[in-house]
Structure formats: structure tokens, C-alpha cells
């Protein structure tokens, strides 16, 4: 049975679309659980649901970035390299996270942290920073060189970096300063602000990525037979 290249763009786009829908659903679920917990109204969820939620929130970005890389034309080397780098970094982070959660790595030994755990933690942090840099490079390139949905995706990726940077340093310091001595209130405000803003920008970024993939797939050749 023959099939045309037209089916390849369709598969790539629908895979990205389903991954984006799954990410949105579980991102909102995770946000609701976190915010309710911060406000003292914990939501009781089954262990299986929480495990599925955690896995999908890690796996769906890998799928989206991989599909975005496949959708890009061969001549867009910088974007392809950046998207491939983000995909690889997310995959390595996912694998390291599984090792930690599955107790494949001994976390404590005689009351002390083994050197292997320290090394893997530093590697995980370096990989995360590398993915942020690669994502920012892709975003800046998209903003400066493209129009339409690609341009909007670039803005979204830059927003992701800004929210990540603000959530790491700027917002916590500002909220603690404004909250004065009410430390618990400050912590609650910081957590809610970071969670809501992060969820919003990531959902917008992956939505625009799905739109950009659709645009790229419409421009792909589709009249050859495999």
C-alpha cells in the first residue's frame, strides 16, 4: 500500500495537537491542586492520577518540541538545532527524574548525600539551564526573523524565559519586600503568582507552537509517493 507525503504533515500536526491538549488539561489540573493547597483547601487526588499528571506534564513538551523540530524546513539550521537541543535536554531531565523517583540512585548514605547524587543533581541543573538558553535563542530568532504565528511563538518563548527569570529571583524578592513581616502570606503570594504566570505562558507558548507547526506543515511538499 502506498502513502503520500501528505500523511506525514498530518501525523506531525495531529501529534502536536493532541500533546498540546493533554498538556493544557493536566497543567490546569496541576495549577488547581497547587493553588488550592496554598490556600489551605487541599484537593484529594489518587496516586495514579498524580503520577499520570506528572508524567504527561514532562512528556508532552518533549513531543511538542520534537514535532516542531520535524516541521521546520531543512534550511532553518539554527531553529532546528535549538529545538533539537531543547528536546534532548527535556528527555535527559525526564530520565534523571525517573532515576531519582524510582530509587535507582541512593539519595542518602549513612546520613550523608552521596557524591553521585550531588553530581547528578548538578548535571540536571546544567541541562535545565541549557534548555532555557536554547529556548530563548529560538525565541529571539523567531521574533527577529519571522512573522505571523512563528513571530508570536518567538514572543511566547521570550515570555517563558522572563517568567522563569522573574520566578527565580525578581518576584520572590519583591513579594517578600512588599509583604513585610507576614512571611507565610509572602510565601503563599509568591507561589501562587509564579504558578499562575508560569502555567499561562507555557500554555500560550505550546498553543502557538502547535499553530506554527500547522503553518509549517501547510508549506511542506505533499504530492510525492513513498
Task: Give the positions of each predicted feature.
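Transmembrane alpha-helical segments of multi-pass membrane proteins
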Residues: 14-17, 21-24, 77-96, 153-166
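C-terminal transmembrane-bundle signature of multipass membrane proteins
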Residues: 29, 162-226
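Interfacial non-cytosolic loop connecting adjacent transmembrane helices
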Residues: 37-49, 103-123, 171-193
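Cytosolic juxtamembrane helix at the C-terminal end of the final transmembrane segment
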Residues: 3-13, 66-79, 136-154, 202-224
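Alpha-helical transmembrane segments of polytopic membrane proteins
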Residues: 47-62, 119-132, 187-199
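Alpha-helical membrane segments in multi-pass integral membrane proteins
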Residues: 126-141, 147-174, 197
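Membrane-proximal helix-loop-helix units in multi-pass membrane proteins
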Residues: 92-150
Amino acid at each position: 500500500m502506498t502513502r503520500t507525503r501528505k500523511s506525514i504533515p498530518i501525523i506531525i500536526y495531529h501529534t502536536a495537537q493532541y500533546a498540546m491538549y493533554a498538556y493544557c488539561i493536566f497543567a490546569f489540573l496541576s495549577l488547581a491542586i497547587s493553588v488550592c493547597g496554598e490556600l489551605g483547601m487541599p484537593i484529594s487526588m489518587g496516586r495514579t492520577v498524580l503520577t499520570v499528571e506528572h508524567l504527561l506534564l514532562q512528556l508532552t513538551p518533549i513531543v511538542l518540541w520534537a514535532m516542531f523540530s520535524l516541521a521546520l524546513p531543512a534550511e532553518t539550521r539554527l531553529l532546528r538545532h535549538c529545538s533539537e537541543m531543547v528536546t534532548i535536554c527535556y528527555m535527559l531531565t525526564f530520565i534523571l527524574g525517573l532515576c531519582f523517583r524510582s530509587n535507582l540512585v541512593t539519595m542518602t548514605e549513612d546520613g550523608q548525600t552521596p557524591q553521585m547524587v550531588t553530581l547528578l543533581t548538578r548535571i540536571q541543573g546544567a541541562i535545565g539551564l541549557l534548555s532555557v538558553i536554547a529556548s530563548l535563542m529560538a525565541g529571539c530568532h523567531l521574533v527577529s526573523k519571522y512573522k505571523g504565528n512563528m513571530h508570536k511563538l518567538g514572543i511566547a518563548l521570550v515570555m517563558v524565559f522572563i517568567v522563569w527569570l522573574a520566578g527565580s529571583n525578581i518576584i520572590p524578592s519583591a513579594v517578600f519586600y512588599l509583604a513585610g513581616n507576614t512571611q507565610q502570606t509572602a510565601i503563599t503570594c509568591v507561589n501562587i503568582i509564579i504558578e499562575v504566570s508560569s502555567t499561562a505562558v507555557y500554555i500560550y507558548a505550546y498553543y502557538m507552537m502547535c499553530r506554527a507547526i500547522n503553518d509549517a506543515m501547510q508549506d511542506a511538499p505533499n504530492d510525492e509517493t513513498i
